[in-house]
Amino acid sequence: MKNFVEELKWRGMLHDIMPGTEEYLLKNQTTAYVGFDPTASSLTIGNLVTIMMLVHFQHAGHIPMALVGGATGMIGDPSGRSEERNFLSEETLRLNQEGIRKQLTKFLDFDCGANSAKLVNNYDWFKGIGFLEFLRDAGKHLTVNYMMAKDSVKKRLEVGLTFTEFSYQLLQGYDFCHLYQKENVRLQMGGSDQWGNITSGTELIRRMADGTAFALTTPLLTKADGTKFGKSAGGNIWLDAALTSPYKFYQFWLNSADEDVSRFIRIFTLLSKEAIEALEAEHAKAPHERLLQKTLAKDITIRVHSEEDYEMAIKASEILFGKSVTEDLQALNESTLLSVFEGIPLIEISRSILDEKPSVLDLLSTLTNSEVFPSKGEARKMIQGGGVSINKIKINSSEEIVNYPLLLNNYLLVQKGKKNYYLLRFN
């Protein structure tokens, strides 16, 4: 067996580990699971650390398991939260589970023989257990004192903790015990905030099944500036292209700070230690070229999305930073085009105007209600100075007839000066 724990150590992915875990893994092919919250139809980059733990676990010859918390997701884990979550319907949870499964197939091999990955949903066993039965079989094994001592409970006591949330660690512990008995699972992994819940499981296994199980956690990532990893100014960075475009996804990684990127490339790629150290040496010679950031962004964008999406993100970046040609602009799909130019003025125009063959001067002044240029005089002056382009083609004459192929048969991109863009949409 490859040494899974050593792999996590050099990558900076190990926080806490129960004594005996490393030795057990070296001697036994083991099944380990990580729980995923199905309260959304997509995972976020905040889930990537634990996903990568499962990836390394599988590469070490072990069996990775993803548990979708269909039952516990109806309640919500109080760990790291200051308020109670909203409950979700079973139908919504099932839809979310399917979305999560599709995303995990990009990282884990579910059909590779003896150590194929597995996916389970804890609703499948909890739905058949009655409240009295659960109290009798599981509740009697953990004392209230034991449960109250957990950090996830302590931190919420001052602001209020419902009995439902208080029971969460018992439910998660029961998951571990169920999987220990039915699926031969011996290890649960998660973020460091899950240590209390995971060890509740090992304790329940000891008491209910007279068995020994193990726990391992990874650090909760923060960025060098102290902010939480996994979010941008606009909110969550999702793995689903419909929620976060591949362009924005790529840009998030490309914008990693120099103080963060060495950690990130160890955690989020499968590059070897030697390859990473060689890249770091090369990066140090010319940090402004951002070699580490580009390598990281390429690797993770291709894995989560596709090579085509990565190429599209590159073209989109070049368009914004002035290195592109018209062909690059025409190659963008609508999702990328709108993502790249999100926030710029989007001006709706009747398509019939094009049949009248207007001049560039008219289009950029009166026909766009003076939104691009307030007057024809100002438009004429900037065009004469070479400061206006349409679809990356410089306008040489204000009397030129508008006869440019529409992007995606709908749009014209107007650039005024170096930084001012306008998107015209013809309806």
Swiss-Prot record:
Q: Which cellular compartments is it found in?
A: Cytoplasm
Binding-site residues for L-tyrosine, renumbered to this chain: Y33, Y168, Q172
Keyword tags: Aminoacyl-tRNA synthetase, ATP-binding, Cytoplasm, Ligase, Nucleotide-binding, Protein biosynthesis, RNA-binding
The record's annotation in SUPFAM superfamilies points to: Alpha-L RNA-binding motif, Nucleotidylyl transferase
Motif extent ('HIGH' region) = 38-47
| Broad EC category | ligase
Highest taxon in the source lineage: Bacteria
A GO cellular component annotation in the UniProt record: cytosol
GO molecular function list: ATP binding; RNA binding; tyrosine-tRNA ligase activity
Give every S4 RNA-binding domain span.
Answer: 361-427
A Gene Ontology biological process noted in the UniProt record is:
tyrosyl-tRNA aminoacylation
Question: Where, in this chain's numbering, is ATP bound?
Answer: K231
Q: Which family does it belong to?
A: Belongs to the class-I aminoacyl-tRNA synthetase family. TyrS type 1 subfamily.
Query: What is this protein's record name?
Result: Tyrosine--tRNA ligase
Which species expresses this protein natively?
Cytophaga hutchinsonii (strain ATCC 33406 / DSM 1761 / CIP 103989 / NBRC 15051 / NCIMB 9469 / D465)
